[in-house]
């Protein structure tokens, strides 16, 4: 029976996570900047969107289940600061936040489950982004405690083009070896064209310790997403369906001038 259960689970996972020709979904959590300096405005904006970053395609997003910031281990609920915005016909969310203390600010979002008809499963991506305040580099590698998350090993801000980025993928606080991590460039203005489909989404795998590595080739916003199958299912029209959970992290890369 254990063998049958394992086989069934693997089949469901393969169908839900690796449907041929399906575009990669990413939960967006993109601030107006990754570093707030003494001369900058202390108020930043954050876009909370559900999208295909490279292709510039968006999907409707309901108001998140959770949205907050963690500074030096202390969490603040920011859910009620979100306001709905439209990107074309699609619903997205935006918030303003005023930085009051030095140190790293870890913003995080847990969206409500998104039903993906094409993949016959729900999608829940837990996204994070780190914004540095006033040059005090404290807290960027702290864990928020999300169901699944990427814990950076490389400081996730102040990155130059060509820097190597590393992170650990965790589910329920435990590293996940041998899992795929999808990587995409946020092609905001659509100027970058991929000569072939495999170049839209880059893919790397975690090692035996759950660590992945990627050398970032271009300035701009990049996102990493490690996908897993949740142990629990959700009902859709009375039938239990699998849930794809994703650990998502956004980083900004700068050209050296």
Model-derived regions: residue spans:
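Bacterial N-terminal signal peptides
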Residues: 8-17
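Short, aromatic- and glycine-rich surface loops/edge beta-strands on solvent-exposed regions
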Residues: 95, 101-116, 222-228
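Beta-strand-rich domain onsets/edges
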Residues: 24-45, 120-179, 185-190, 236-257
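Short, acidic Ser/Thr/Gly-rich low-complexity loop/linker segments typical of extracellular
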Residues: 190, 194-209
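Start-of-domain marker
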Residues: 24-81
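Short acidic/polar inter-strand loop motif in beta-rich domains
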Residues: 55, 112-119, 230-236
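Aromatic sugar-binding surface patches on proteins
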Residues: 84-95, 208-211
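Sec/Tat signal peptide C-region and signal peptidase I cleavage site
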Residues: 18-24
């Amino acid at each position: 029976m254990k063998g049958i259960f394992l086989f069934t689970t693997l089949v469901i996972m393969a169908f839900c996570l690796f449907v041929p020709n399906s575009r990669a979904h990413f939960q967006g959590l993109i601030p107006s900047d990754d570093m707030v300096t003494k001369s900058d405005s202390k108020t930043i904006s954050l876009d909370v969107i559900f999208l295909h970053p490279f292709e510039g395609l968006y999907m409707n997003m309901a108001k998140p289940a959770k949205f907050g910031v963690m500074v030096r281990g202390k969490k603040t609920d920011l859910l009620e600061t979100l306001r709905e915005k439209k990107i074309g016909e699609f619903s997205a969310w935006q918030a303003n936040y005023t930085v009051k203390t030095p140190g790293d600010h870890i913003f995080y979002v847990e969206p409500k489950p998104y039903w993906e008809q094409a993949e016959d499963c729900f999608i829940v991506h837990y996204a994070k982004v780190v914004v540095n305040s006033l040059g005090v580099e404290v807290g960027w590698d702290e864990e928020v405690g999300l169901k699944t998350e990427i814990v950076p090993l490389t400081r996730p801000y102040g990155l130059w083009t060509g820097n190597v980025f590393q992170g650990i993928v965790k589910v329920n606080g435990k590293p996940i070896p041998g899992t795929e991590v999808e990587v995409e460039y946020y092609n905001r203005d659509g100027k970058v064209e991929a000569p072939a489909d495999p170049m839209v989404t880059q893919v790397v795998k975690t090692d035996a310790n759950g660590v992945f590595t990627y050398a970032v080739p271009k300035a701009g916003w990049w996102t990493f997403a490690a996908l897993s199958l949740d142990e629990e299912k959700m009902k859709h029209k009375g039938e239990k369906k699998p849930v794809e959970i994703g650990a998502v992290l956004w980083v900004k890369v700068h050209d050296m001038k």
